[in-house]
């Protein structure tokens, strides 16, 4: 099927609204993507006609809800090309998935004198859990520095590994710079040193196909709400032998096999031992609808359209005086910028007056802001429903702001 942005836009009700008297130009999908009618409808239909608590229920609605939930687990496994549905853990989002690994695998496998490697471009969700783990156990956190263009200093990376390196935690695509990291080479290097690899895929899964078996990563995590799905649901992929060896990090219902006041508790097998309590079943149903939606459009076709739009945007933005762009020429999803010495909040507020939604601030990447010696940046993100006309409006808006503010 040929990709049609007009057909895609027709599936997203919010794109019909106006903001401040102007048609909405939503350029903030990297923070959270809008939802197609298919996702909204699937979740609403579940709550209207199919809701019940999953697991252990013998009545029809419970059995149906359980089957639908487990079907989405298989669907997510297929989406990532995982080896089995039992390698998919439902989590609240990328942040919870990383914390799960840090608190379960990390507590058991990282000790005093060991080290973990991250990069300078990471989202706080892929920094803070490892800082907390290192503080708990007396390990060292090592950081891959960046080049001025926002790519990794790859020549430094081999020297960061040693026999005490336990984990490389790395983003696939930077949420600020759009840098796409060379995962295959990094994963191979980590494995040569006996280290495991966790990939933060939050900014990647909506932009291109992901194959965790081809990558060879040990853990991969993403959030549904950035993939046109609901909030409060995400996926943690973990290699089966790792998940089965990991202890649960939360206790409660569903994650147990047996509970005894005298003999203690035994755990369910993975992935269910990591899903304590009543799950976000509606969110899981919505996630399944989102996976179906993007799969039917074709991630390869989506990627081709978005890359064409990105090239158009980077060229068009050259017409804005005093615009400072951050990040490499080859990027995915996002364009971070500042306009002269004007604060990002001021620029973002003016753009909002023109009906253009961008993100402003440190983007949960304060170390990256420190690297560029700025308190904040504006970030325009491009999704499959954005258009060249919206890019033109962004350019015109920035030109107008420059003229007004000088």
Swiss-Prot record:
Keywords carried by this UniProt record: Cytoplasm, Lyase, Pyridoxal phosphate, Transferase
GO biological process entries: cysteine metabolic process
GO cellular component: cytoplasm
Subunit relationships: Homodimer. Interacts with SufE and the SufBCD complex composed of SufB, SufC and SufD. The interaction with SufE is required to mediate the direct transfer of the sulfur atom from the S-sulfanylcysteine.
Pathway the protein takes part in: Cofactor biosynthesis; iron-sulfur cluster biosynthesis
Any GO molecular function: cysteine desulfurase activity
Cofactor: pyridoxal 5'-phosphate
Similarity comment: family membership: Belongs to the class-V pyridoxal-phosphate-dependent aminotransferase family. Csd subfamily.
Positions of the catalytic residues: 364 (cysteine persulfide intermediate)
Gene for this chain: sufS
InterPro entries, per the entry: Aminotrans_V_dom (IPR000192), Aminotrans_V_PyrdxlP_BS (IPR020578), Cys_dSase_SufS (IPR010970), PyrdxlP-dep_Trfase (IPR015424), PyrdxlP-dep_Trfase_major (IPR015421), PyrdxlP-dep_Trfase_small (IPR015422)
Organism: Klebsiella pneumoniae (strain 342)
Keyword Transferase tagged: yes
Cystine pairings recorded for this chain: none
Reactions catalysed: (sulfur carrier)-H + L-cysteine = (sulfur carrier)-SH + L-alanine; L-selenocysteine + AH2 = hydrogenselenide + L-alanine + A + H(+)
Localization annotation: Cytoplasm
Protein name as it appears in the record: Cysteine desulfurase
